[in-house]
């Protein structure tokens, strides 16, 4: 099924095993990691839905093992490192708006549509029964996955003995049900002493190549390397000096980096989604 000239590209990725030393983790943190990984898999599930228009169907049972691996790595039949060209025969070029917008929607139609949240990071654009455009918030469109993820984050929060992490997990759990992420983002920035970390939810907007309005779901489950993080601490004090020496006009250097900025090193134990 993969085009003959694309077969060589199935060899461009090398598998890497993600590992970390968990011997120094508390028993509570060891229990939390599998829960966070389970939550992350739901972000993967959503990203598949965001990436692939419903009108494009692929019979994955017809793919060889090598083809299926390449398909899985790319989250669909388009080669992400080759201009999103289709690598499966008979599949058209990927729509610029992925699955965030109807594939038959024109820019003129979208721009003429008077809808306040159409540019929101957290809405899917669909058509009503009468063919007119409607927006559906992520917390409704992905209600099943968001609810499950929220429950898992709350479960992890109950186990955690780190008050900052507990607070962040609970706020992120609530955010997934409301699509209001600011408070949990601030709580994440405020964490200082946590060993376990998770980035989760709709964050980057690169998947929407039509407008760049829509966020894609992703997750990283992380374990902080405290030894290396301590080594990086000394560089925080250099940030103002480094900024002052940037080769740009003074107006671009007016905002000084805070002395409470953090530089940390992490081992990634799980990636999911965008």
PLM feature segments, named:
Residues 1-2, 106-107, 225-226, 232:
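General structural signal for secondary-structure boundaries
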Residues 138-141, 145-274:
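Contiguous, non-catalytic segments that form substrate-binding/exosite surfaces or channel walls
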Residues 2-168, 172:
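N-terminal helix-rich structural modules
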